[in-house]
Regions:
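Flavin-dependent oxidoreductase catalytic cores
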Residues: 1-148, 152-163, 168, 176
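Beta1-alpha1 glycine-rich phosphate/pyrophosphate-binding loop at the start
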Residues: 11, 147-210, 214
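Short amphipathic alpha-helical segments and helix-helix/interface helices
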Residues: 39, 87, 201, 219-222
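Short glycine/proline-enriched coil/turn segments at helix->beta-strand junctions
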Residues: 46-48, 165-166, 207-209, 225-227
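A short, aliphatic-rich alpha-helical micro-motif
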Residues: 68, 204, 222-225
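A conserved short coil-to-beta-strand element within the FAD-binding core of flavoproteins
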Residues: 212-225
Length: 232
């Protein structure tokens, strides 16, 4: 209220400090929107706009919190590292193609580690962090590529190669994609890890990749596609 009375234009409500890091930059165990009550309390006593991040991970959640009056503006931090086109995709009605931040904190882990190497941070969801100037060459010319396994690596390759103009088929021996993520997401409150697989599947298919399940990558099976390249 004092800040509001001093003619501050807006207040951005966050929480915690370095000593309570997990309440500032939450890991996967925290529920999206868990600290919206903080912004709501501030709004009760000020007449200026209130901004808050509130662990927002979807446009639907952002819109709901605005409608509830929890806050006046939405702040996005890590979601824009995971997908710099987050806002653009919402404007274009392509919300289903957003690569969601899974709250794994690899961005901060890598930045702290790489600070001593004078390099950049990384992201588990966005391999182009720090490599934004690299443009995908559309040089696939329809060449056939067979990818063995629909885990995170295989699906990432499928999406990027499809965007480059390759004819991509992914062979997955199980009934569902995900690989090791299907184990990693099982502990309580680790469900967000599955988002990266869901988002990769959506974007890989939209780019033109085909995924075949219950398919073991035997040599005879692979040869049926006459691939120019095989990734395993």
């Amino acid at each position: 209220k004092i800040l509001s009375d001093r003619k501050i234009d807006a207040i951005d409500v966050s929480s915690a400090c370095y000593d309570t890091f997990n309440y500032w930059l939450e890991p996967t165990t925290f529920t999206p929107g868990w600290r919206k009550y903080l912004a709501a309390e501030v709004k009760k006593v000020v007449d200026i706009p209130v901004l808050a991040a509130n662990l927002i991970r979807s446009p639907e959640q952002a819109e709901k919190q605005l409608e509830e009056g929890t806050q006046d503006f939405v702040s996005l931090g890590r979601p824009l590292i995971a997908d710099p086109h987050w806002v653009e995709k919402v404007e274009q009605g392509k919300e289903n193609t957003i690569k969601r931040c899974i709250c794994c904190l690899y961005c901060f882990e890598s930045m702290e580690e790489n600070a001593y190497k004078y390099t950049h941070g990384k992201c588990s969801v966005n391999p182009f962090v720090g490599r934004e100037s690299q443009i995908l060459d559309r040089n696939g010319r329809g060449d056939k590529v067979v990818i063995i396994g629909a885990g995170v690596s295989g699906l990432t390759a499928a999406e990027l190669l499809s965007k480059r103009g390759f004819d991509v088929t992914v062979l997955e021996k199980e009934a569902q994609p995900g690989g090791q993520i299907n184990l990693a997401k099982m502990p309580p409150n680790k469900e967000k890890l599955a988002w990266c697989v869901e988002d990769l599947i959506t974007n890989a298919k939209l780019a033109g990749a085909e995924i075949e399940y219950y398919t073991t990558a035997l040599k005879s099976r692979i040869e049926q596609y006459s691939p120019k390249y095989v990734i395993c």
